[in-house]
A protein has these predicted regions:
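C-terminal transmembrane-helix exit sites in multi-pass transporters
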Residues: 49, 54, 112-133, 256-275
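Helix-helix packing/entry segments at the starts of transmembrane helices
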Residues: 39-41, 105-111, 174-195, 228-264
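Hydrophobic/small/kink-forming positions within alpha-helical transmembrane segments
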Residues: 20, 24, 83, 87, ...
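Glycine-/small-residue-enriched transmembrane alpha-helix faces in small-molecule transporters
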Residues: 1-40, 83-84, 88, 92, ...
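Specific transmembrane alpha-helical segments of multi-pass solute transporters/efflux pumps
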Residues: 22-23, 55-109, 144, 224-242
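Hydrophobic transmembrane alpha-helices of multi-pass small-molecule transport proteins
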Residues: 50, 127-147, 167, 198, ...
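C-terminal-most transmembrane helix of multi-pass membrane proteins
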Residues: 43, 51, 59, 216, ...
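Transmembrane alpha-helical segments that form core, pore/gating elements
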Residues: 50, 116-117, 152-206, 234
């Protein structure tokens, strides 16, 4: 492996670590503020953090030219569509985390990796055999992870699974606009759009006080600065020149790190049944990202 690829791999691993630990920040934040308040503030922070990142990445990529009106229109439409999906997915996730462990939330959220190619069938995108094997394993993993001995599923797990469905839609929206608009600029817009959308239920339903926000400043700042702003920028830099399959495999470690973070920081020890579910889920995620034999032969 080349030196540049090792560096990129390290950057992507750091991204996965930041995102994995973010589940802990999201859980701790719920001790002080409501889910809409948490998301509202962190998205505004993430958008603000990305503003200087846009200038830095312009110099990094050597792109200083101005965009035409059509490009700007596509950028704004993409940012707004992504922002709507991100707000919906994140609020579902945040509500779910209130009622489940961070490890389970991390693995259930990671289902979007399997759902994206399945949803892609509606857009005439074919799925390889490994994806379908992964889907079957994921269903088995979800059974052990979410359904207890009494055949009951937790309310939090349902919300997080719904979040995974919306995150899959979010990825498809990004995929549609990513080739037509600057990724970091679009992400900056989506964060502000998500923040505005979360502001309405924040003011109507939660009525946060400054004392609550100050008490939750550490998890909110982590989620806003590191998870939204820094990690996204690191992902863009890390994926440059890196094989997409390898990149996605490294980033999928986020789910494993969320479990470890839950154990080490929150002392949330998974049951043997949940561990089996996590193993099946992670194997399914890996399978879904591996190239099929037919793809290799064409390469």
């Amino acid at each position: 492996m080349k030196k540049g690829q090792i560096k990129s791999g390290g950057i992507l691993l750091l991204t996965a670590i930041i995102w994995g630990i973010a589940f802990v920040a999201q859980s701790v934040g719920m001790d002080y503020v409501g889910p809409f308040t948490f998301n509202c503030v962190r998205f505004f922070i993430g958008g603000i953090v990305l503003i200087p990142c846009i200038a830095i990445l312009k110099k990094w990529n050597g792109t200083e030219g101005e965009s035409n009106k059509e490009d700007l229109r596509t950028l704004w439409i993409g940012g707004i569509c992504c922002g709507i999906a991100l707000a919906a997915a994140s609020c579902l996730q945040q509500i779910g985390i209130m009622h489940t462990t961070v490890g389970k939330a991390g693995f259930i959220t990671a289902c979007y990796i399997l759902l994206v190619p399945v949803f892609g069938l509606f857009f005439h995108k074919k799925c390889g055999i490994l994806v379908w094997i992964g889907v079957l394993m994921a269903v088995a993993g979800l059974y052990f992870l979410c359904i207890n001995e009494n055949l009951m599923i937790g309310k939090g797990d349902i919300f997080v699974f719904l979040c995974a469905i919306v995150f899959a839609i979010h990825i498809l929206v990004i995929d549609h606009f990513s080739s037509k608009a600057d990724g970091v600029k679009m992400s900056c817009i989506q964060f502000f759009v998500s923040g505005i959308l979360c502001l309405v239920p924040t003011l109507v339903l939660e009525h946060p006080h400054m004392a609550q926000l100050l008490a939750a400043w550490q998890p909110i700042l982590y989620a806003g600065v590191l998870s939204c702003g820094v990690a996204y920028t690191l992902q863009i830099i890390g994926q440059k020149g890196m094989n997409p399959t390898v990149a996605s495999l490294i980033l999928s470690l986020e789910s494993v790190i969320s479990v470890l973070a839950g154990i080490l920081i929150l002392h949330q020890t998974p049951t043997s049944r949940e561990v089996l579910g996590c193993i099946l889920m992670f194997t399914a995620i890996l399978l879904a990202q591996l190239p099929t034999p037919s793809k290799k032969s064409r390469q």
